Amino acid sequence: MTWAPTGPTNVELRKLIRDLKKAACEYNAPVWRDVAERLSRPRRQRAEVNVGKLDGLARRGVIQEEETVLVPGKVLGDGVITQPLRVAAWRFSRTARMKIEAAGGECLTIRELLEENPEGSYIRIIE
């Protein structure tokens, strides 16, 4: 019987999780530890959020204008988005990226958001 590592096998994802945990301690930002734990889940349990859901949350006022939406998983392109949102995620589908940018929004990787905002302020986690 051979030993297999637990957790994600994607090397880039493992590095990101390590960096998120380090930032959580260094900047006293519990949001990064929460995101690291969510990204450590098996792939089938990770978040998959459609752009239509993000648009609905923005229209209802759940997502404020100054906040960055963080999806600890993949953003999918089902639905219509009319609000210009700033979205960070591990992955984006091609159509999701096109729809967000067409609505005047911005797509970021979680690593880009971490480097830009290490304190973790004004972040809304959506699953």
From Swiss-Prot:
The keyword Ribonucleoprotein applies. GO terms for biological process: translation. GO terms for cellular component: cytosolic large ribosomal subunit. It comes from Methanopyrus kandleri (strain AV19 / DSM 6324 / JCM 9639 / NBRC 100938). Belongs to the eukaryotic ribosomal protein eL18 family. Keywords: Ribonucleoprotein, Ribosomal protein. Gene3D superfamilies: 3.100.10.10. GO terms for molecular function: RNA binding; structural constituent of ribosome. InterPro entries: Ribosomal_eL18 (IPR000039), Ribosomal_eL18/eL18-A/B/_CS (IPR021132), Ribosomal_eL18_arc (IPR022947), Ribosomal_uL15/eL18 (IPR021131), Ribosomal_uL15/eL18_sf (IPR036227), Ribosomal_uL15_CS (IPR001196). The keyword Ribonucleoprotein applies. The gene is rpl18e. PROSITE patterns: RIBOSOMAL_L18E. This is Large ribosomal subunit protein eL18. Pfam families: Ribosomal_L18 (PF17135).
